């Protein structure tokens, strides 16, 4: 049978006092040895720094004037090489080592743009000279004609003239368009289906324009653009101021261009 556990544990034995004292002494000795090593390391670092500073000062003091002049000449030559490299770099002749040609092109373009920014006066002078040369032209109309006339090739004008037709047809279209703007959709569609006509070869030389409303065998009706009235061919010719004509259809010409 197990005996019950007592409420408090009693200490049966302990280390002797001599052993505890010796352990504390060893720990203190270790700490002292570590601190001494750290101090030695710090002293060595300080001595090295002082020795390097002394050596550099001695070398500077021991140099002769000739050696000092040689060093200054080396510095000046290095500065000159840097300046020449910058000039060649700005002119686009300098190529950076280790870069492909496309990057070389971008570098030269950036250099040229920076050079233009640094020299705005030259660009401004060129602009002022161009303005002065343009101001010496006799008149603005002549200058515009001299500039715009050669800019348009003759071949580009051929299809334009072919599509527009003659000046007479253009005038018919212009007047018909002005009249069509004031009409409704139904009237505009009717006008698009009707060909344009105009008088020609009259004794008085007058010209009247209209639309061919009806052109059946038995009846021909023409709408006058001037007043919008429906007229027969003879009335249309009389409306032009030529009076009565034996054959009025000979003096009425149908336009080839489509109406609006």
Swiss-Prot record:
GO terms for cellular component: nucleus. It comes from the Eukaryota. The keyword Isomerase does not apply. It is found in: Nucleus. One of its GO terms (biological process) is negative regulation of DNA-templated transcription. Residues 50-70 are annotated as: Disordered. Keywords: Nucleus. Belongs to the Ninja family. This is Ninja-family protein 4. It comes from Zea mays.
């Amino acid at each position: 049978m197990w005996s019950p556990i007592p409420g408090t544990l009693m200490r049966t034995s302990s280390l002797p006092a001599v052993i505890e004292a010796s352990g504390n002494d060893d720990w203190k000795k270790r700490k002292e040895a570590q601190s001494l090593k750290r101090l030695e390391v710090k002293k060595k670092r300080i001595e090295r720094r002082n020795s390097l500073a002394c050596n550099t000062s001695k070398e500077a003091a021991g140099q002769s004037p000739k050696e000092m002049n040689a060093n200054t000449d080396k510095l000046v030559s290095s500065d000159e090489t840097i300046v020449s490299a910058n000039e060649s770099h700005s002119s686009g002749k300098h190529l950076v080592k280790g870069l492909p040609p496309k990057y070389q092109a971008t570098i030269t373009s950036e250099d040229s743009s920076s050079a233009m920014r640094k020299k705005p006066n030259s660009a401004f002078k060129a602009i002022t000279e161009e303005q002065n040369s343009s101001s010496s032209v006799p008149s603005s109309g002549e200058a515009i004609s001299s500039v715009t006339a050669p800019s348009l090739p003759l071949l580009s004008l051929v299809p334009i003239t072919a599509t527009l037709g003659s000046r007479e047809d253009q005038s018919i279209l212009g007047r018909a368009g002005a009249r069509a703007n004031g009409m409704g959709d139904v009237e505009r569609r009717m006008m698009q289906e009707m060909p344009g006509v105009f008088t020609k070869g009259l004794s008085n030389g007058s010209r009247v324009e209209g639309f061919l409303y009806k052109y059946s065998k038995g009846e021909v009706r023409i709408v006058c653009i001037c007043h919008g009235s429906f007229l027969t061919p003879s009335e249309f010719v009389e409306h032009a101021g030529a009076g009565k004509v034996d054959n009025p259809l000979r003096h009425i010409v149908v336009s080839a261009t489509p109406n609006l």
